[in-house]
Structures are given as structure tokens and as C-alpha cells.
A protein has these predicted regions:
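Bacterial Sec-dependent N-terminal signal peptides
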Residues: 1-27
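Extracellular/periplasmic carbohydrate-active domains that bind, remodel
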Residues: 22-213
């Protein structure tokens, strides 16, 4: 919270105080503005509630996931996420291998962790990426049919992705060579798609080669 406060003040000072303008009574306008920004920042940080992730761990292997780099684990990983959500939140851990998956949906209170040495691999089969039609659709969704992604969340609270491992989306052209992918339209899945989510954490994780931005 302190870092957010200081960052807010610093950015606003850079934007709004490019010159050291002198005001009345020898107090610069910059000083006055920084003081006001400090008051605003203090007010904002009072309303920030850091997310403390529950201690419960949900290892995807206990739900049937196999980290052999080829088995499709969408159902197993989603089972772990759903169990974590029902339990009131915690960490869904991916460890000890390479886990292929299609679209998985994060839910409130769930922290998805890819542990050190582990990798989450995006499926290269478009059939593993079902459409997720959001409540409020954008131009990109309606016209270009951008509705597929590897990781999806909508209206989730306290949700995140962390770990020292890697999410490799495998979005290279060679993996999506069909005519439906030409022009980067509906055939290229997003990496992470979060809509109307609050208190989102993205920490430590390496993200590589998403098929779409």
C-alpha cells in the first residue's frame, strides 16, 4: 500500500509538475500540488485492502493432472480450481512437470501458482478453447470474435497468478496454421483474459508466446 501511494504521488508529480512554478507566499505551486496529491493518495490507500491468500493448497495432481507434456489436463486443473473456490479460496498449485491444458476459468479467491521448474502449456488444438461470451461485449468480441483464451476470469474478486514457473502459451504460427487463424482473428486465443475482476495479482510468473495480445 505504501509503494502504491508513493508511486501515485511520483507519477502525478511528473505529469503535473514539470516546472518549479512559484506561487504566493514563497510556496511553489509544485509544493502545493504535491501536498494535495499526498492527501488524495492517503485517502485512496485507506480503501485498499491487500489480498491475503488462504493457506489451503490444492495440488492439481491430486485431481488427476499428469505433467508429462502431452496429456490434456483441462478437466483436472479446473476441478482443482472449483474445489479451491468452494473451500473459500487458496492456492491451486501446478508443480513437478509440464501440464498441457485448454481454457481454464479462475474464480474468486483462487491463486494459480506455477511452481519453480514447472510449466503450464497451452493446447495447440483450437477445440480446447471454447468461446467465453462475456456479459458486456466489446467491438473486438462482436466483430472479430475474440472470445477464446487459455486463462479466463469474469467478475472474480481476489484472483491471481504467481510462481517461479512458466506459462508457455505456444502461440507460434506453426501451432495455429489453419485458415481460421489467418489475419489473427478468431483462431488465435488470448493468453490471459480477465473481465471486470477486482484485486488481481500477477506476481513472479514468466509468460511466453501468447497467440494473441
Amino acid at each position: 500500500r505504501l509503494m502504491i501511494r508513493n508511486f501515485f504521488i511520483a507519477i502525478c508529480s511528473i505529469i503535473f509538475c514539470p516546472y518549479n512554478l512559484q506561487g504566493q507566499n514563497g510556496v511553489s505551486l509544485e509544493t502545493k500540488l504535491v501536498h494535495k496529491l499526498t492527501l488524495v493518495a492517503d485517502s485512496l490507500t485507506k480503501h485498499l485492502k491487500p489480498w491475503i491468500v488462504p493457506v489451503s493448497i490444492f495440488d492439481v495432481r491430486k485431481y488427476g493432472a499428469i505433467g508429462d507434456g502431452s496429456t490434456l489436463n483441462t478437466t483436472a486443473i479446473q476441478k482443482a480450481i472449483d474445489a479451491c473456490f468452494v473451500a473459500g479460496g487458496g492456492t491451486v498449485r501446478i508443480a513437478g512437470g509440464e501440464y498441457v491444458t485448454g481454457t481454464i476459468e479462475l474464480k474468486s479467491g483462487v491463486m494459480l501458482e506455477v511452481a519453480k521448474g514447472a510449466r503450464l502449456l497451452g493446447s495447440t488444438n483450437l477445440k480446447d478453447y471454447p468461446d467465453k461470451v462475456e456479459r458486456f461485449q466489446s467491438v473486438m468480441n462482436v466483430i472479430h470474435k475474440y472470445r477464446i483464451s487459455l486463462i479466463y476470469a469474469e467478475r472474480a474478486e481476489r484472483v491471481g497468478i504467481c510462481g517461479e514457473g512458466e506459462i508457455y502459451f505456444r502461440g507460434e504460427a506453426k501451432n495455429f496454421p489453419g485458415p481460421e487463424t489467418i489475419g489473427a482473428l478468431e483462431g488465435r486465443p488470448f493468453g490471459i483474459r480477465m473481465i471486470e475482476c477486482n484485486n488481481v495479482v500477477l506476481k513472479g510468473i514468466t509468460l511466453r508466446n501468447s497467440a494473441a495480445w
